[in-house]
C-alpha cells in the first residue's frame, strides 16, 4: 500500500514539475514583452495549481484544430480576390493628408491596398436613432444582409431589428447572422434562434464555448467585431452591440451605455466583406467572397477627399496590425490627440507613445468612464494615471453612463473608430476591427462628439490624485501585476 501511495505521489510530483517546466519554456520562447512574461511566470510559481489552470484557459492564443486549419489557409486564397480588387483602380484614394500619410503607408505595405473612397460617411451617436436607421436599411435591402456582433441581447429595440431581419429573409433577402457564443449566450438560449432559422436566416454561433475543450482551444478568444453589411454597398461598424441600452445591464447601476457607430456607403463595404467572409469561413468552412465594386457606387460622391482603411485582427489575420496602427497614429500627432476608451490597460509601447506625445507638446486628452462594468479593469487602469498625468496628459472621467465608444482623433483630421479597447485582450487576442478615416469633415464631427463627452466628464486633478489613499495604491499595484493577463 505504501509503495502504491509513494508511486502516486511521485507521479503527481513529476507531472506537476513537467507542467511547470513546459509552461515556463512556452512563456520564454514567445517574443512577448517582459511584464507580460513575468506576470505569467510569477502566477504559475506563486499560485502554482491555480496558475497552471489559468494558463490552460488563457495562456496560449489558439483556436480549435479545424478552425486553425481554415485560418491558416484563408489569406492565401483571399489574396487572389484582393489581387482582383486592385484592378478596380477607381475605388482607391491615392493621396492622403500629411498627418495620415504614415498610417496609410503602413496599411498599404502590410495589407496591399490603398485607402478606399466613400460616397457617404456618417457618425451616429444616438442608439435609438441608429436602430431606426438600421431597420430602415434592412427593409430596403435588395440582395443580402450580413451581420456579426459580440453581444445580441433579446428585448426592446433588439427585437425590432430581429423582426426586420426575419421579414427580409421571408421576402427572399439572403441573411447571415454571426454572434459570439459567450457574449450572446442569452440570445442562443432564446426562441429567436429557431424563429430566425425557420425564416431562412443563417445563424452561426461563433467560437463556441465548450468546457470539455478548454485544453484544446483557448476560451477567451472572442468574436468582438461589430459589422453590418447590406447589398455590398452599406457598411456599419463601431462600438455598439445589438442591445437596447435602456435594458442592457440595468442591474449593474452604471447607467446607460454610450456608443458610437459609423455608417458608410460605397466600396468600403467590399473590403469589410472580405473580413466577414474570412470569419464566416473560419466558423463554417464555407467561403462567401463579396462581389467586386462597380463605378456606380461612387456616383454623386459627397466625400471626394475622404480615404478609409479597414484593419482587422485576430487569429489568422495580420499579426500586430492594429497595435502598429495605433502607435503610428499617436506618433503622427502634432497638435492634438483625443482618445476615448472604456478600458484603459495599454501596452508599454502605447503608454510610452501617449506620454511622449504629451511631452513633445501635443495636447493629449483621454476620456474614460467614471463607472465601469469590470472591477478588474477599473483598478488596473488606475495604475497608469500617475505616469500619464506626470507627462501632461489630461484624463477625463465620463459621468453620465458607461462610455463604451472607442475612438482616436489626431489633429482633427485622422480618425480611428471601431471595436478595439486599449487593453491586452483587444490588442492581442480578439477578432476586432478598426476603421481608419482620413477626412477633415469627419474629424470635425468626431471632435464635436468628443467635446460633448468632455463636457459631461470630470478632470482628474494631478495634485489630488497624488494624495489618494494608501490602500488604493496597494490595490492598483496588485492589479498592475495582473494587467498583462487581462
From Swiss-Prot:
It is a multi-pass membrane protein. Its EC number is 2.7.8.-. GO terms for molecular function: cardiolipin synthase activity. Keywords: Cell inner membrane, Cell membrane, Lipid biosynthesis, Lipid metabolism, Membrane, Phospholipid biosynthesis, Phospholipid metabolism, Repeat, Transferase, Transmembrane, Transmembrane helix. It holds the Pfam family PLDc_N. It catalyses: 2 a 1,2-diacyl-sn-glycero-3-phospho-(1'-sn-glycerol) = a cardiolipin + glycerol. It is found in: Cell inner membrane. Residues 219-246, 399-426 form the PLD phosphodiesterase domain. The active site is at residues 224, 226, 231, 404, 406, 411. It is an enzyme of class 2 (transferase). The chain crosses the membrane at residues 3-23, 38-58. One of its GO terms (biological process) is cardiolipin biosynthetic process. Gene3D superfamilies: Endonuclease Chain A. GO terms for cellular component: plasma membrane. Catalyzes the reversible phosphatidyl group transfer from one phosphatidylglycerol molecule to another to form cardiolipin (CL) (diphosphatidylglycerol) and glycerol. Belongs to the phospholipase D family. Cardiolipin synthase subfamily. ClsA sub-subfamily. This is Cardiolipin synthase A. It comes from Buchnera aphidicola subsp. Acyrthosiphon pisum (strain APS). The gene is clsA.
